[in-house]
């Protein structure tokens, strides 16, 4: 179940606010400039769909984002527990970083924990199937895919080169709860 938990960035032990309610989550995230919404598809993707199948199922929604925001490229990332790079990628994604562009992700299946460091608070957003999140450019954040990741996501980019991170060097991510599934 999707969820939002908000902490102070000085106290990882006591959540200040928490909700599983979609409208409340959207309201809190919109207040800090984060887009959060649900997408639907009427296509059955089947087990382990390839990237072309995933893109085709959501092409209309992708086209709307491109028209609205001018994004230039998109791709599909799939991660499974047997991926030999999962530990390396998890370590990289868990390091607090920013991007020079919005980080736009749509969860086709599975789940991931986006953690945003904004205005003295940590916003932990558990995104699941059909959740779209767009983190504004320059927002310090990290992503936890869990120890045994199992997800497929569409990534949308301003920059045709794809995912380019600027690591902050802050170890704050180590202090906050991780994704447990």
Curated annotation (Swiss-Prot):
Reaction(s) the record says it catalyses: 1,2-dihydroxy-5-(methylsulfanyl)pent-1-en-3-one + O2 = 3-(methylsulfanyl)propanoate + CO + formate + 2 H(+); 1,2-dihydroxy-5-(methylsulfanyl)pent-1-en-3-one + O2 = 4-methylsulfanyl-2-oxobutanoate + formate + 2 H(+)
Residues carrying the site annotation Important to generate the dianion: 105
Subunit comment: Monomer.
This protein's name: Acireductone dioxygenase
Any matching Pfam family: ARD
Example of a GO biological process term: L-methionine salvage from S-adenosylmethionine
Enzyme Commission number(s) of this protein: 1.13.11.54, 1.13.11.53
Species: Sodalis glossinidius (strain morsitans)
InterPro entries xrefs: ARD, ARD_bac, RmlC-like_jellyroll, RmlC_Cupin_sf
Residues with site note (May play a role in metal incorporation in vivo): 96
Pathway given in the UniProt record: Amino-acid biosynthesis; L-methionine biosynthesis via salvage pathway; L-methionine from S-methyl-5-thio-alpha-D-ribose 1-phosphate: step 5/6
Gene3D superfamilies: Jelly Rolls (2.60.120.10)
Bound cofactor: record note: Binds 1 Fe(2+) cation per monomer.
Annotated site residue numbers, May play a role in transmitting local conformational changes: 102
Enzyme class: oxidoreductase
Binding site for Fe(2+): 97, 99, 103, 141
Keywords carried by this UniProt record: Amino-acid biosynthesis, Dioxygenase, Iron, Metal-binding, Methionine biosynthesis, Nickel, Oxidoreductase
Record's function text: Catalyzes 2 different reactions between oxygen and the acireductone 1,2-dihydroxy-3-keto-5-methylthiopentene (DHK-MTPene) depending upon the metal bound in the active site. Fe-containing acireductone dioxygenase (Fe-ARD) produces formate and 2-keto-4-methylthiobutyrate (KMTB), the alpha-ketoacid precursor of methionine in the methionine recycle pathway. Ni-containing acireductone dioxygenase (Ni-ARD) produces methylthiopropionate, carbon monoxide and formate, and does not lie on the methionine recycle pathway.
Lineage: Bacteria, Pseudomonadati, Pseudomonadota, Gammaproteobacteria, Enterobacterales
The gene coding this protein: mtnD
Cofactor(s) the protein requires to work: Fe(2+); Ni(2+)
């Amino acid at each position: 179940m999707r969820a939002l938990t908000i902490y102070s960035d000085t106290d990882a032990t006591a959540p200040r606010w928490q909700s599983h309610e979609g409208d409340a989550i959207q309201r809190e995230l919109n207040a800090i400039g984060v887009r959060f919404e649900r997408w639907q598809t009427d296509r059955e993707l089947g087990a382990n769909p390839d990237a072309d199948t995933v893109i085709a199922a959501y092409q209309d929604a992708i086209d709307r984002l491109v028209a609205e925001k001018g994004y230039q490229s998109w791709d599909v990332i799939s991660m499974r527990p047997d991926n030999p790079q999962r530990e390396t990628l998890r370590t990289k994604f868990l390091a607090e970083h920013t991007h020079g562009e919005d980080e736009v992700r749509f969860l086709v299946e599975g789940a991931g924990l986006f953690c945003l460091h904004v205005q003295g608070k940590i916003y932990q957003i558990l995104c699941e199937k059909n959740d779209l999140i767009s983190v504004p450019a320059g927002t310090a954040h990290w992503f936890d895919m869990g120890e045994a990741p199992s997800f497929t996501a569409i990534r949308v980019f301003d920059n045709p080169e794809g995912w380019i991170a600027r690591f902050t060097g802050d170890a704050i991510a180590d202090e906050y709860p991780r994704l447990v599934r």
